[in-house]
């Protein structure tokens, strides 16, 4: 059976490849391969709990805020379990909500316009949507301008962005005044005006389908809808079909009730199961059968030791582990959060993607766009609820305790969890399970493929030099890995090398 290797697979960073077994132009089997050992957990050992937020915040330059906040939540949970901490102040909860909401807007724009949008642009796919063209399209450049505004907003609270320093266990290390909050709100409103009104979505869809453009309805909204229309016309609803199992840690906590705007739970067997934090934690395990790690690096992440490499495993093919919930693979990300919330604004996934809970390449894009609009409409409310005269930092925070804690969080890519074991003020054990592990990990010991490995089966490969549908499926899961792409053919030779795409570029590379 012919074999194709695509390595790396995304437009930034690298360290992920996919090997496909193809027969009669259709993918029969896929292996998702993470190519780099990281071991960030090991660096935290022997340090005070507060240090973990500083260290793990550097795990990723994209999800920088998310790891920092998740680690802070793990430390806070451990301290509360030890009986030495009562929880962060109300202002800290609201500001974390607002900051993560701003991050969602920024990251969703990065994904839709820079990471996956070019796959549906005129320059890459001949769709006629030249506003999406990388580097030259008006929509692409407008998104970059508005992403910058959101990063500036995050920097006002965190001191800098990426890698802010203001968010710490116990709350916020700075005390934003009314003028700072107003400045952040002003930047968010500028981006909101670029996006346009949520209620205009049906009209904008009709405009895009008719080749019309009304900037008064929001330039950003027009371009996002263009991506969705181009994807629908390209048949994205018929590729990347997953098992329709979803999991979310939930996010955006109400400081008064503890309710989550995007709820915690799973979707399986056609129904939503809302869950407590303890129920979620109890259900999660990691499998290392096909990972270059020792067996005791897997299992229950609360007690497993930090990852220890094992390079002698003959059948291993990934530095990623295989997370499972109750023994099953689970898809995470915007579609998981909205399915569990039972939200399908304007019935877009139902109408265009074959069903609100259907896992496919198109619905992943639709859900991301829907979520951006949902969260946008909440961020200003969270900012308005902050009282700058009240504290942002708990006065009882201390690193001097013994306890175990778990931080559950939801970066834009999906479920993230940090596990921390503290002994006499020093970290004894640390584990991280990222969204990309859930979606793009390897098989488990039962032979069960990851979400990506399952979703790629059945995708057509019309051209080995340009497997565009395969790339669209991989990128729809927003893997946090990537850059220039190499496509390897059945004879082991590189058939094509893909350079960073510029509009109109074709010689020397294939536009994927």
Language model: regions and residue ranges:
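Mixed-charge (Asp/Glu-Lys/Arg
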Residues: 425
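Active-site bordering "gate/hinge" segments
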Residues: 1-413, 434-512
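Catalytic activation segment of kinase domains across protein kinase-like and atypical kinase folds
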Residues: 431
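Catalytic-core signal marking the mid-to-C-terminal active-site face
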Residues: 428
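Aromatic-rich beta-strand edge motifs centered on tyrosine
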Residues: 421-422
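Short glycine-rich, acidic/polar surface loops and turns
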Residues: 417
């Amino acid at each position: 059976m012919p074999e194709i290797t695509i390595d790396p697979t995304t437009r930034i960073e690298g360290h992920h490849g996919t090997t496909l077994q193809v027969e009669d132009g259709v993918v029969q089997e896929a292996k998702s391969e993470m190519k780099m050992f990281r071991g960030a957990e090991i660096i935290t050992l022997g340090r005070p709990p507060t240090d973990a937020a500083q260290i793990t915040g550097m795990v990723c330059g994209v999800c920088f805020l998310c790891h920092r906040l998740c680690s802070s939540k793990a430390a806070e949970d451990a301290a509360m379990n030890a009986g030495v901490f009562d929880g962060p102040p109300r202002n800290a909860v609201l500001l974390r909500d607002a900051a993560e909401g701003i991050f969602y807007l920024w990251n969703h724009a990065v994904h839709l316009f820079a990471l996956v949008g070019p796959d549906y642009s005129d320059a890459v796919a001949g769709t006629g949507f030249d506003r999406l063209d990388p580097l030259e399209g008006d929509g692409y450049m407008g998104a970059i301008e508005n992403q910058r505004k959101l990063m500036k907003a995050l920097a006002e609270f965190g001191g800098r962005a990426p890698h802010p320093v203001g968010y710490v266990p116990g709350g916020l290390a700075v005390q934003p005044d009314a003028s700072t909050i107003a400045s952040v709100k002003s930047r968010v409103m500028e981006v909101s005006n670029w996006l346009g009104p949520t209620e205009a979505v049906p009209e904008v869809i009709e405009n895009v389908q008719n080749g019309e453009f009304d900037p008064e309805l929001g330039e950003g909204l027009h371009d996002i809808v263009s991506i969705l229309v181009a994807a629908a016309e390209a048949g994205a609803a018929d590729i990347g079909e997953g098992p329709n199992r979803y999991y979310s840690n939930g996010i955006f906590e109400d400081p008064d009730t503890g309710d989550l705007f995007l709820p915690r739970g799973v979707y399986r067997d056609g129904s939503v199961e809302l869950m407590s934090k303890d129920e979620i934690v109890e259900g999660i395990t990691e499998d290392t059968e096909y990972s270059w790690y020792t067996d005791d690096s897997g299992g229950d992440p609360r007690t497993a030791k930090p990852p220890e490499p094992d390079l002698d495993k003959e059948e291993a093919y990934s530095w990623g582990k295989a997370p499972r919930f109750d023994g099953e693979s689970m898809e995470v990300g915007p579609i998981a959060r909205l399915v569990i919330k039972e939200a399908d604004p304007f019935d877009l996934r139902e109408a265009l993607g074959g069903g609100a809970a259907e896992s496919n390449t198109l619905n992943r894009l639709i859900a991301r766009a829907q979520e951006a609009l949902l969260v946008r409409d909440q961020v200003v409310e969270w900012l308005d609820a902050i009282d700058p005269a009240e504290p942002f930092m708990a006065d009882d925070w201390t690193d001097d305790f013994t306890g175990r804690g778990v931080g559950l969080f939801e970066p834009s890519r999906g479920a993230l969890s940090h596990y921390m074991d503290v002994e006499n003020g020093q970290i004894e054990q640390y584990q991280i399970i990222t969204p990309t592990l859930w979606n793009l990990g390897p098989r488990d010991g039962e032979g069960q493929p990851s979400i990506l490995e399952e979703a790629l089966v059945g995708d057509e490969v019309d051209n080995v030099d340009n497997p565009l549908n395969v790339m669209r499926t991989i990128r729809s899961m927003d893997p946090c890995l990537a850059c220039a792409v190499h496509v390897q053919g059945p004879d082991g030779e590189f058939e094509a090398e893909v350079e960073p795409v510029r509009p109109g570029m074709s010689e020397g590379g294939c536009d994927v």
